[in-house]
Amino acid sequence: MELNGARLDLDYSKKKYQELIDYTDQVAQWAKGNYGLSIGSNQQLVRQFEALNVEITELTDKGQKSASKDQLKLISRDGSAEAKQLADTTLKYRQALKLANTYFANFINDNTDGFVHPSINTMGARTGRMSIQNPALQTLPKGDDTVRRAFLPKDDDHVIITSDLDQVEFRMFASLSQDPNLIQLFLRSDATGSDPFTEIGREVYQDQSMVKSDKRRNLIKGVVYGRLYGAGVSKQALTAGVPEEQMRAVSNAFDERYPGMQRFQKYVEQTGSTRLEAEGQGYVHTWTGRRIPCDEDRVYTLVNYLIQGGAAEVFKSNLVKLDQADLTDLLIVPVHDEIVLNAPREDAEEIKQLVRKCMTTTDNWSVPLTADVDGPLENWGAKYV
């Protein structure tokens, strides 16, 4: 994949880079004109928020008050109208600056004849997840098409096909927890084509009219992935943008319906603590037998290591299956749980079916680890529009 590289739409990249830089310049002028501050300065932002009667609770590693992303989200949720506007604008400014400098500037400056050749580290994280550098594609905003639109098929005779594992970490969590209600829900969801989070919401809220666009669905996702990443209720509430009491009520209702997840979470943490006391090291073994240790004071991370590490192994196993299916020359880049491919235009539908087969895992799991396949696409971002 590193040798193949990815073809870029350089005209689009240059246009988007300039749009983002123009936007950040306008925001910087707005902040200077209205508040006399440099919006890129943490200290100046903190002082301005305190002048707006906002309590800053987040701290840097050096103990200084911080206008961090989490702090800005908190202000956006609970602050006055003026404080909320400044927080929201700062978040948008930072995102635009990151997209411009981390991605589009690198696309423009570092391409080779219109192609970029990312560096892929197959063990880039402790869990075994891959990391992608030059450009850092693993930090792409999930579900955003802005940067992805710059990625094109290798020529006009090819199209883009992508395949993304479906809620793979949640499915693994459900399988390992052996919660019967959760397993049956996934099996039913797969059979009917319904959305698992919406199905859970209908049961937790006892509202069969709930649809996928319902905002309460995000609270269900917040509980699930909060457990997975070791986040407490307060952090889950901040991420979801709701009061802590509301999030706690959803969490409690979820546990009443699906107690197996919390039970499994406690089992993993207790096992890790026992190993730490007996062996001097807390750790878990993934489904392939790979051992992942945790820091001494972070036993709570073991659930995440177990699930995320296992998901990384499933994804890599699927890449091996793609190789065995003679699709290696079509692979462009892996990002998160998604693989992006070139496909000859006339063979796109046939290749889609082959990719779906390779990316789906049913053996050894109570809940099938399924995959979406999208295409044919004229650019990667078209999937997310």
Named regions from a protein language model:
Residues M1-G143, L152-V159, D166-E169, R202, ...:
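Conserved "right-hand" nucleotidyltransferase catalytic core of DNA-directed polymerases
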Residues L165, D337-I339, A371-V373:
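A structural signal for short, well-ordered beta-strand segments
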Residues E169-Q206, T288-P293:
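Metal-dependent catalytic core segments for phosphate chemistry
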